[in-house]
């Protein structure tokens, strides 16, 4: 989404922003990264979708990109990865996840549970648009954003593992012969 990419680039000008099909990009580029964060589209997994289908009577399959990414990274990625999504309306068939707030996070490293604000969605919205008459102007992309404290927590867990791994690799390289 060009609009989301432009806003991200505005907020984080030192980051490299790639506008592409993230699912396809991941498949061909995952080996290039020490840490991968994925957040595939969630509307078809959401508990809200379950009720929407019951009301509108329009059946919709869950988007399997979520499971494709988890399975693929779990089998082939040597780096660290975390895939975030909403709590689904069904029982996940891959139960190795961490539940934090309104999120399930599948990963290949430990992510300790932290307390999230009870009204996490409202808290996030107030952070970006405040309260009052303009709060309803919140875009879907902003509403779907992961709480920044949760994102930082997951990143810190990954960075800690990367630093430990790199320190260990460094010691094993020079430790035996010196």
Feature-to-residue mapping (PLM):
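Conserved active-site and SAM-binding loop architecture
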Residues: 1-178
């Amino acid at each position: 989404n060009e609009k989301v990419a432009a806003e991200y680039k505005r907020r984080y000008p030192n980051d490299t922003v790639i506008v592409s099909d993230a699912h396809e990009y991941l498949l061909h580029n995952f080996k290039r990264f020490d840490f991968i964060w994925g957040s595939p589209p969630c509307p078809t997994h959401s508990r809200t979708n379950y009720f929407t289908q019951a009301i509108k009577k329009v059946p919709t399959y869950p988007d399997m990109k979520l499971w494709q990414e988890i399975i693929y990274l779990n089998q082939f990625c040597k780096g660290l990865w975390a895939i975030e999504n909403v709590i689904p309306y069904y029982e996940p068939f891959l139960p190795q996840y961490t539940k934090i707030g309104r999120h399930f996070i599948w990963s290949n490293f430990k992510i300790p549970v932290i307390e999230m604000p009870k009204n996490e969605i409202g808290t996030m919205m107030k952070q970006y648009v405040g309260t009052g008459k303009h709060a309803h102007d919140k875009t879907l992309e902003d509403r779907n954003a992961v709480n920044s404290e949760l994102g930082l927590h997951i990143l810190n867990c990954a960075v800690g593992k990367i630093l430990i791994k790199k320190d260990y690799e460094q010691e094993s390289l020079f430790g035996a012969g010196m």
